[in-house]
Curated annotation (Swiss-Prot):
Recorded GO CC terms: extracellular region
Main location, first listed in the record: secreted
Keywords attached to this entry: Amidation, Amphibian defense peptide, Antibiotic, Antimicrobial, Fungicide, Secreted
Domain of life: Eukaryota
Modification sites for Leucine amide: 29
Name this protein carries in UniProt: Dermaseptin-H7
Described purpose of this protein according to its UniProt entry: Has antibacterial activity against the Gram-negative bacterium E.coli and the Gram-positive bacterium S.aureus. Has antiprotozoal activity against L.amazonensis. Has antifungal activity. Has no hemolytic activity.
The organism's taxonomic lineage, starting at the top: Eukaryota, Metazoa, Chordata, Craniata, Vertebrata
Amino acid sequence: GLWSTIKQKGKEAAIAAAKAAGQAALGAL
């Protein structure tokens, strides 16, 4: 349903943000 789609998009966005944060942290080393 719509809610599961919203949750899936949110999870994907959270994963993408975590990856970006990890890349930024590595770049700052």
